[in-house]
Amino acid sequence: RQSKKEMDKKWSELAQKMGTMAEDLVAPSVPRVLRQLANCSEEQLEYVAVRAKKRNAKTNQIKEFDVIVVCGDYLLVNETKSTLVPSDVDQFVVSIPEVRDYYPHYAGKKVIGALASLYVDESLVRYGEKNGLIVLGTGEELMEILNSPGFKPQEF
């Protein structure tokens, strides 16, 4: 019985490390993605944070964001998953508007969301796109936009 507990703990630690590794691989690409989508120059980049822990002024709750990038008129919130499933899309779409409660000083920015994973099934790309999300997966520049040409992300 003790060895099962130990094995479960090791699996949990491995899953955590895989998630962190995926975040580490995705994070450097996110500012470029926003600059590309928002036609925003390097000089206009206001804020980039990886694993940013912020307190909600209303609820006092602390939340960690995988990547937050502010450039021009936009605030992009990225969530990275080691394995992306449909429920991740659903939960992320619901949580995006809450970003404003954690970053009230960017109230005038248009908030857009990006979900990333190292491998994203085509059906999940379309599902994310249908929900107004940027979908990021591995490509020539490690992470590239997988949405249809001309896709405009929903502004939350």
Identify what each model region corresponds to.
Residues R1-L37:
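Amphipathic, low-proline, heptad-repeat alpha-helices and/or compositionally biased low-complexity charged/polar-rich
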Residues M21, L25, I62, S87, ...:
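Charged, alpha-helix-enriched surfaces in structured cytosolic catalytic cores
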Residues V30, F65-D88, F92, P97:
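Conserved catalytic cores of phosphodiester-cleaving nucleases, focusing on short active-site segments
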Residues N39-V48, A107-V111:
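A short coil-to-beta-strand element that immediately follows conserved catalytic motifs
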Residues E42-G72:
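Active-site metal-binding core of divalent-cation-utilizing nuclease and nuclease-like domains
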Residues A52-K54, L84, V120, L142:
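Residue-level detector of flexible, active-site-proximal loop/helix-junction positions
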Residues E98-G108:
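Arginine/glycine-rich "motif VI" loop of SF2 helicases in the C-terminal RecA-like domain
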Residues V111-F156:
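Domain-level recognition of nuclease-like catalytic cores that cleave nucleotide substrates
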